[in-house]
Design a protein with these regions (language model features):
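Short gly/pro/ser/thr-enriched loop/turn and capping motifs at secondary-structure boundaries
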Residues: 94-98
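A conserved active-site cap/scaffold subdomain adjacent to cofactor or substrate pockets
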Residues: 6-91, 101-103
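Catalytic-core signal marking the mid-to-C-terminal active-site face
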Residues: 104-231
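Short, small-residue-biased leader/transition segments that mark boundaries at the very start
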Residues: 1-3
């Protein structure tokens, strides 16, 4: 705000990060309801002042990607998103109030964040979504149902978000497929990504200098295994 006062329209992000402590121990409580309210208030302040706003949410106190992790991330990120924040930091992968992160959490949180973004998008009301012509075609001239209509097939892709890991099978199919829980599926998916995705973000010469200096164990490609450097 001080920068905007001196230089109107200067690029800036309003990024306040007030944190909550559990008064019984003094430990940070990033997944608390109080933390969610504080971050939502910061987002609303940013909207009031007309500033692009970034807040922190998704900072569960749980040390594992368990039920506590899910419900704390769910309500903190959802409240922040619906309060009008433009950016939400720490929203994926974080555990133990920012003292750790977890590959399984990243892929679980990807599902969660997609669903939350869908709720922020809300219900679109326009000529296409009201579909009066489609109703007339189906109800007065057609089969009386929408199952095979081209608009139904189209809106299946635009209106619905399908989770990558979340289970929506019926009970019998779930049992037949091994009765896995989301942590097990997330572990397999995280390993699959790590073993098959090799982004090229570093100049090869710089990467070689880093590998010569440190015992890097990460593969650079699906067929190359890097052995630790022997000192």
């Amino acid at each position: 705000m001080c920068i905007r006062d001196r230089v109107p329209r200067a690029p800036a992000i309003f990024g306040t990060w007030p944190f909550v402590s559990d008064l019984r121990t003094g430990a940070m409580s990033g997944g608390s309801g109080e933390q969610a309210v504080l971050m939502a208030a910061c987002a609303q302040m940013g909207r009031y002042y007309g500033l692009p706003t970034g807040i922190a949410a998704g900072m569960t106190d749980s040390k594992l990607p368990d039920a506590q992790s899910g419900y704390e991330k769910g309500y903190t990120v959802t409240l922040g998103a619906h309060s009008g924040a433009n950016l939400i930091y720490e929203s994926a992968g974080m555990q133990a109030s920012l003292l750790g992160c977890c590959p399984e959490s990243y892929v679980i949180d990807n599902d969660m964040l997609g669903a939350i973004n869908r709720t922020v998008r809300g219900i679109e009301v326009n000529e296409d979504t009201m579909a009066f012509e489609t109703m007339q075609q189906v109800c007065t001239e057609g089969p009386g149902h929408y199952l095979g209509h081209e608009q139904t097939l189209s809106r299946m892709q635009s209106d619905y978000l399908y989770p990558e890991l979340g289970d929506r099978e019926n009970i019998n199919n779930w049992i037949d497929q091994g009765s896995s829980n989301i942590e097990e599926r997330a572990s397999l998916r995280a390993r699959e990504i790590i073993e098959s995705h090799f982004p090229d973000h570093i100049d090869p010469e710089i990467e070689m200098r880093i590998r010569n200096e440190f015992p890097v164990r990460i593969q650079t490609g699906p067929s190359q295994t890097i052995e630790p450097r022997v000192a």
